[in-house]
């Protein structure tokens, strides 16, 4: 069936901000869907609140709404745009839930909008646990013994049937939010109560435990003529009991017999037919009991998922793009496979002649007090994928691509320590983020494969692979550098050992290993991902390295520019940097360069095979990048766009003769190196907070007496404020040195005077050597001391005077010329008592670039990429700052609900995972939209609790009177109540937890509050008030930990976030009109 002609316009629902469990794989699927549908001539309308996405670029859809993904807001968009159909399968759980809401509230019927890609009934059947179980039984498939419960009473009834241990999951949530494994009554009670609260339908599914079973996934695509193909089978290295998003996974499945594979394949197809997924991609999960082979079906997702992004990258088969076309009526045999240049139709099942490994990336170090053991609730923040010719090579490449400091199977434990074995056994039994390394240590300590299997339930086949690598390491160590013959070295490289790992094992420099490889002429060749195991030739340059015989790279002799990506997502380095890399590639392609992308993150648009001319799916390490440069010989390499990952390589790449374009590595170092930067600042006569660099604790104490407290302390060279703290006295400072950092001459610690209550400002600018143009001035809403990545901000500034802004503009220009910036630069200032203090300068793409580009309509990353390639700003027509005639607010999304036990107080360490944007005619409206976009719904009135620190007591009176005007009744803790009483506002007095009951926590648990404002300073005060913030989070009460944000919230109460919707295209037309005027 060719495409449908009875629909002309289609609304695509996006996934919103990046949260744990739902990351940038949905930007990848959404961007593909937009492209695919417009290719077929449909008018595409998109809604997504996340500005850091490629899909929300104005050229991706006909009308783009960066608005909250809430049914009332989407109703406004439907009313205005009148789409014929809505496609909800591209935006994860957020989009599915929103589509079901639109259906439930009659919006789709009211405007005659058809749901395509999945029906409301199919979504409900797959998501509603009891319906799903019934459906599976009807086709003869077994599900785990389970039942649903809507109350604690029902939960205990189910428990009698399934017994301990049992797995508890709330319905309609994603990433396993609120779920867990209960081994006893107490845990059962706690997890069930939390789950009932978090499920939008207040329903739990309680399953028998399949812990230790093998877990598999099938990625299936079906069209309306009932053609079905399996795109890819995926095997979880980690057994059941660990969320698949937190498991190491391997494709294709390695340990299934052919018979088991066929059974599973047939079962998957039966599931899709039964659930009624007429078109598109779905993911079906199975569990197999290794003892007796019993197979059960765990769940299915009737949408594009994290696994389908992985399967697309693993096979080269673009699931989202194909799914979008199937949704409008095409069948698989009518669609061509792009990778083979149309030689094969999309109905050919991909075959692969390599092994793919995915390893999740965790950020537990950011969440002190979090439980870092892996369970059924997803906790990873990103992932890395690697391709190799065998399992060992694939695994090794993934380990070094993770960027956690591992060069391979590095040792975790000192085996001579008396408790070494105890530690290893604990880490194997209670899986944490580093279990894979402890497995290697177990073999080093003499444990057997069976011994490790009994503790981990990881299939013995995988364990044998790791054991063999450990044995090889021992042999190489024993043979020494002299024993590294051509044959031995080639064998090690074929098994994926990195030069860095070999150099560590042999105690020589990494460059020595590289020299030896040159001498023996041992270099990687590049193979193509072609969907067909080389049966047909492929024009698509999608490459991975291996130490095989034949190279398929076939480089051209065009002018090329290579862009280095950011590797796996992590907090502090996420989708914003990928956005910049994609823009660099797009801009330079338009200018006739051949672009080469190097990255290893399977979720992103940058690793899509048609984003760049050539894609190398490789770890972003020195060795891997140099090998690619050796084959491709690029004219220039861009390291400033992928965050800290490529930036760390800049100097070494330059030393190896690789041409870095844009700001030079030396200029980058001048901005990052404390002493060199200070010299530049002094030469320009700019103000900086007093600071010092120290290499020992006593020296720090001495300096602190000169500078004075509070101080910001942090190690030098970090991204996302890792290990950064504000200390308030000498005792606090000593504790920091003893607990938080290891300080030495190589790794000094920086001390800065902390400007309490200052307003922080972020400025993005571009310099081409002749002129500097400001991209945008963003005023932070949270005051200084909250990491810039965790602060909301407004463009244009909403309180700063023109005079102060001009002062900053002047300073940015001076700095850009002084540092010799070519391309993007980000500068941070703090404003206090009408003085401008320079905090830092980053001569690279910052995480604010996508937001500024959406707010002003100027594609900064593209403009700057062209500057790096030699074009001037004037020749591109970008010569003056754009100040839009409306307000844009960026607000962040924090993952505290995934980490019970962590204090949600904002501070200098970045912990947000994503962002949303709100736009309005006034600051109040923009802020209200941003708050709605990240899920904060502020009720009108109710009771507010105020408990603030000493430094905020002057301003709290003003805040209290604003809240009273808005209809709130007030409660306050003792110190705050006294101040308010003196000003004639009489709040109800409440007890702190140690002052007797009923205390604050009791009142929070009784749902007495609709809003809480709590600010704290100093180690002790923060510790004491932590229960209040945790309580607010647990009971879902809106709370603010800075006064500035509380004032902004009061302002936003005066605006209606759901009143009007405006597309990005309309906004940018307003900018254009105001520029022409």
UniProtKB/Swiss-Prot annotation:
<keyword id="KW-0436">Ligase</keyword>
<feature type="binding site">
    <location>
        <position position="285"/>
    </location>
    <ligand>
        <name>ATP 1</name>
    </ligand>
</feature>
<dbReference type="InterPro" id="IPR005479">
    <property type="entry name" value="CbamoylP_synth_lsu-like_ATP-bd"/>
</dbReference>
<feature type="binding site">
    <location>
        <position position="243"/>
    </location>
    <ligand>
        <name>ATP 1</name>
    </ligand>
</feature>
<dbReference type="InterPro" id="IPR011761">
    <property type="entry name" value="ATP-grasp"/>
</dbReference>
<comment type="function">
    <text>Large subunit of the glutamine-dependent carbamoyl phosphate synthetase (CPSase). CPSase catalyzes the formation of carbamoyl phosphate from the ammonia moiety of glutamine, carbonate, and phosphate donated by ATP, constituting the first step of 2 biosynthetic pathways, one leading to arginine and/or urea and the other to pyrimidine nucleotides.</text>
</comment>
<feature type="region of interest" description="Carbamoyl phosphate synthetic domain">
    <location>
        <begin position="554"/>
        <end position="935"/>
    </location>
</feature>
<feature type="binding site">
    <location>
        <position position="842"/>
    </location>
    <ligand>
        <name>Mn(2+) 4</name>
    </ligand>
</feature>
<feature type="binding site">
    <location>
        <position position="828"/>
    </location>
    <ligand>
        <name>Mn(2+) 3</name>
    </ligand>
</feature>
<comment type="pathway">
    <text>Amino-acid biosynthesis; L-arginine biosynthesis; carbamoyl phosphate from bicarbonate: step 1/1.</text>
</comment>
<feature type="binding site">
    <location>
        <position position="787"/>
    </location>
    <ligand>
        <name>ATP 2</name>
    </ligand>
</feature>
<keyword id="KW-0055">Arginine biosynthesis</keyword>
<feature type="binding site">
    <location>
        <position position="176"/>
    </location>
    <ligand>
        <name>ATP 1</name>
    </ligand>
</feature>
<feature type="binding site">
    <location>
        <position position="299"/>
    </location>
    <ligand>
        <name>Mn(2+) 2</name>
    </ligand>
</feature>
<dbReference type="Pfam" id="PF02142">
    <property type="entry name" value="MGS"/>
</dbReference>
<dbReference type="InterPro" id="IPR005480">
    <property type="entry name" value="CarbamoylP_synth_lsu_oligo"/>
</dbReference>
<dbReference type="Pfam" id="PF02786">
    <property type="entry name" value="CPSase_L_D2"/>
</dbReference>
<keyword id="KW-0479">Metal-binding</keyword>
<feature type="domain" description="MGS-like">
    <location>
        <begin position="936"/>
        <end position="1077"/>
    </location>
</feature>
<feature type="binding site">
    <location>
        <position position="299"/>
    </location>
    <ligand>
        <name>Mg(2+) 2</name>
    </ligand>
</feature>
<dbReference type="InterPro" id="IPR005483">
    <property type="entry name" value="CbamoylP_synth_lsu_CPSase_dom"/>
</dbReference>
<feature type="binding site">
    <location>
        <position position="215"/>
    </location>
    <ligand>
        <name>ATP 1</name>
    </ligand>
</feature>
<keyword id="KW-0067">ATP-binding</keyword>
<dbReference type="InterPro" id="IPR036914">
    <property type="entry name" value="MGS-like_dom_sf"/>
</dbReference>
<dbReference type="InterPro" id="IPR016185">
    <property type="entry name" value="PreATP-grasp_dom_sf"/>
</dbReference>
<keyword id="KW-0665">Pyrimidine biosynthesis</keyword>
<comment type="similarity">
    <text>Belongs to the CarB family.</text>
</comment>
<dbReference type="GO" id="GO:0005524">
    <property type="term" value="F:ATP binding"/>
</dbReference>
<dbReference type="GO" id="GO:0044205">
    <property type="term" value="P:'de novo' UMP biosynthetic process"/>
</dbReference>
<feature type="binding site">
    <location>
        <position position="714"/>
    </location>
    <ligand>
        <name>ATP 2</name>
    </ligand>
</feature>
<feature type="binding site">
    <location>
        <position position="301"/>
    </location>
    <ligand>
        <name>Mn(2+) 2</name>
    </ligand>
</feature>
<feature type="binding site">
    <location>
        <position position="755"/>
    </location>
    <ligand>
        <name>ATP 2</name>
    </ligand>
</feature>
<feature type="binding site">
    <location>
        <position position="129"/>
    </location>
    <ligand>
        <name>ATP 1</name>
    </ligand>
</feature>
<dbReference type="InterPro" id="IPR011607">
    <property type="entry name" value="MGS-like_dom"/>
</dbReference>
<feature type="binding site">
    <location>
        <position position="753"/>
    </location>
    <ligand>
        <name>ATP 2</name>
    </ligand>
</feature>
<dbReference type="GO" id="GO:0006526">
    <property type="term" value="P:L-arginine biosynthetic process"/>
</dbReference>
<dbReference type="GO" id="GO:0004088">
    <property type="term" value="F:carbamoyl-phosphate synthase (glutamine-hydrolyzing) activity"/>
</dbReference>
<feature type="domain" description="ATP-grasp 2">
    <location>
        <begin position="678"/>
        <end position="869"/>
    </location>
</feature>
<feature type="binding site">
    <location>
        <position position="840"/>
    </location>
    <ligand>
        <name>Mn(2+) 4</name>
    </ligand>
</feature>
<feature type="binding site">
    <location>
        <position position="840"/>
    </location>
    <ligand>
        <name>Mg(2+) 4</name>
    </ligand>
</feature>
<dbReference type="Pfam" id="PF02787">
    <property type="entry name" value="CPSase_L_D3"/>
</dbReference>
<feature type="binding site">
    <location>
        <position position="786"/>
    </location>
    <ligand>
        <name>ATP 2</name>
    </ligand>
</feature>
């Amino acid at each position: 069936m060719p495409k449908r002609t009875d629909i002309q316009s289609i609304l695509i629902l996006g996934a919103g901000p990046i949260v744990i469990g739902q990351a940038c794989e949905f930007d990848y699927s959404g961007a593909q869907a937009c492209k695919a549908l417009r290719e077929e001539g449909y008018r595409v309308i998109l809604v997504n609140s996340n500005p850091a996405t490629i899909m929300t670029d104005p050229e991706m859809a006909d009308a783009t709404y960066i608005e909250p993904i809430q049914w009332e807001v989407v109703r406004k968009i439907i009313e205005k745009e009148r789409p014929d159909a809505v496609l909800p399968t591209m935006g994860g759980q957020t989009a599915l839930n929103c589509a079901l809401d639109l259906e439930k509230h009659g919006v789709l019927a009211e405007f005659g909008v058809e749901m395509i890609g999945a029906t409301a009934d199919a979504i409900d059947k797959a998501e509603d646990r009891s319906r799903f179980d019934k459906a599976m039984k009807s086709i003869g498939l077994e599900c785990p013994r389970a039942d649903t419960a809507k109350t604690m009473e029902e939960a205990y009834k189910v428990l009698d049937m399934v017994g301990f241990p049992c797995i508890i999951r709330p319905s309609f949530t994603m990433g396993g939010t609120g779920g867990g494994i209960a081994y006893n009554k107490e845990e059962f009670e706690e997890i069930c109560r939390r789950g009932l609260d978090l499920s939008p339908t207040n329903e739990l599914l309680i399953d028998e435990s399949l812990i230790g079973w093998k877990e598999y996934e099938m990625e299936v695509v079906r069209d309306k003529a009932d053609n079905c193909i399996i795109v890819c089978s995926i095997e979880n290295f980690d057994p059941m009991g660990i969320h698949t998003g937190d498991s190491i996974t391997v494709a294709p499945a390695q340990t299934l017999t052919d018979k088991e594979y066929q059974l599973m394949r047939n079962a998957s197809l039966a599931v899709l037919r039964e659930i009624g997924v007429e078109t598109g991609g779905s993911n079906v999960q199975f569990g197999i009991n290794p003892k007796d082979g019993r197979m059960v079906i765990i769940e299915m997702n009737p949408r594009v998922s994290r696994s389908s992004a992985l399967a697309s990258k693993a096979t080269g088969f673009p699931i989202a793009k194909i799914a979008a076309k199937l949704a409008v009526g095409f069948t698989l045999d009518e669609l061509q496979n792009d990778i083979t240049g149309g030689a094969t139709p999309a109905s050919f099942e991909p075959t692969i002649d390599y092994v793919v490994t995915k390893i999740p990336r965790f950020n537990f170090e950011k969440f002190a007090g979090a439980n870092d053991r892996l369970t059924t609730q997803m906790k990873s923040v990103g992932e890395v994928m690697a391709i190799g010719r065998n399992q060992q090579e694939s695994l090794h490449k993934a380990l070094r691509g993770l960027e956690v400091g591992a060069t391979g199977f590095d040792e975790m434990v000192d085996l001579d320590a008396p408790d070494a074995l105890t530690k290893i056994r604990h880490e194997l039994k209670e899986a944490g983020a580093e279990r894979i390394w402890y497995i290697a240590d177990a073999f080093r300590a003499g444990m057997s494969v069976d011994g490790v299997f009994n503790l981990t339930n990881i299939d013995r086949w995988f364990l044998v692979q790791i054991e063999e690598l450990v044995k090889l390491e021992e042999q190489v160590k024993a043979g020494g550098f002299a024993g590294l013959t051509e044959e031995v070295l080639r064998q090690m490289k074929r098994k994926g050992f990195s030069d860095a790992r070999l150099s560590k094992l042999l105690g020589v420099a990494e460059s020595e290993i590289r020299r030896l490889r040159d001498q023996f002429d041992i270099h990687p060749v590049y193979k193509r991902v072609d969907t067909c195991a080389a049966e047909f030739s492929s024009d698509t340059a999608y490459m991975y390295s291996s130490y095989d015989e034949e190279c398929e790279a076939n480089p051209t002799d065009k002018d090329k520019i290579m862009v280095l990506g950011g590797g796996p997502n992590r907090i502090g380095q996420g989708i914003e940097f990928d956005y910049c890399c994609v823009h660099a590639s797009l801009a330079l392609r338009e200018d006739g360069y051949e672009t080469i992308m190097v990255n290893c993150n399977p979720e992103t648009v940058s690793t899509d095979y048609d984003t760049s001319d050539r894609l190398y799916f490789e770890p972003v390490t020195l060795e891997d990048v140099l090998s690619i440069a050796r084959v491709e010989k690029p004219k220039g390499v861009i390291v400033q766009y992928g965050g800290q990952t490529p930036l760390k390589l800049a100097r070494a790449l330059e030393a190896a003769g690789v041409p870095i374009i844009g700001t030079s590595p030396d200029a980058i170092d001048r901005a990052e190196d404390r002493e060199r930067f200070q010299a530049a600042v002094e030469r320009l006569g700019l103000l900086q907070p007093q600071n010092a660099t120290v290499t020992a604790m006593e020296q720090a104490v001495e300096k602190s007496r000169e500078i004075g407290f509070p101080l910001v302390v942090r190690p030098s060279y970090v991204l996302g404020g890792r290990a950064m703290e504000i200390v308030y006295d000498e005792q606090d400072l000593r504790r920091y040195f003893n607990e938080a950092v290891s300080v030495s001459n190589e790794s000094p610690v920086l001390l800065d005077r902390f400007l309490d209550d200052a307003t922080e400002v972020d400025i993005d600018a571009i310099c081409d050597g002749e002129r500097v143009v400001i991209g945008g001035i963003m005023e932070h809403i949270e005051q200084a001391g909250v990491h810039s990545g965790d602060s909301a901000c407004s463009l244009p500034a909403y309180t700063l005077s023109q005079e102060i802004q001009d002062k900053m503009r002047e300073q940015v220009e001076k700095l850009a010329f002084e540092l010799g910036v070519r391309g993007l630069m980000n500068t941070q200032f703090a404003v206090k008592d009408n003085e401008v203090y320079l905090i830092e300068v980053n001569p690279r793409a910052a995480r604010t670039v996508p937001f500024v580009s959406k707010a002003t309509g100027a594609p900064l990353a593209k403009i700057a990429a062209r500057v790096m390639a030699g074009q001037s700003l004037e020749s591109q027509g970008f010569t003056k700052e754009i100040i839009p005639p409306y307000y844009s607010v960026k607000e962040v999304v924090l993952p505290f609900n995934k980490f019970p036990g962590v204090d949600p107080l904002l501070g200098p360490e970045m912990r947000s995972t994503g962002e949303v944007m709100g736009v309005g005619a006034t600051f109040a409206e923009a802020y209200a939209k941003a708050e709605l976009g990240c899920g904060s719904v502020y009720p009108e009135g109710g009771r507010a609790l105020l408990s603030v620190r000493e430094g905020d007591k002057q301003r709290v009176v003003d805040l209290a009177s604003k809240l009273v005007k808005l209809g709130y009744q007030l409660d306050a803790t003792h110190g705050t109540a006294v101040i308010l009483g003196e000003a004639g506002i009489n709040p109800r007095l409440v007890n702190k937890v140690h002052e007797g009951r009923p205390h604050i926590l009791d009142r929070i648990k009784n749902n007495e509050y609709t809003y809480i404002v709590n600010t704290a300073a100093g180690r002790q005060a923060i510790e004491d008030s932590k229960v209040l913030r945790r309580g607010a989070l647990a009971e879902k009460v809106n709370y603010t930990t800075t006064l500035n944000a509380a004032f902004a919230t009061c302002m936003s109460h005066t605006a209606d976030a759901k009143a009007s919707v405006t597309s990005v295209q309309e906004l940018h037309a307003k900018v254009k009109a105001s520029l022409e005027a």
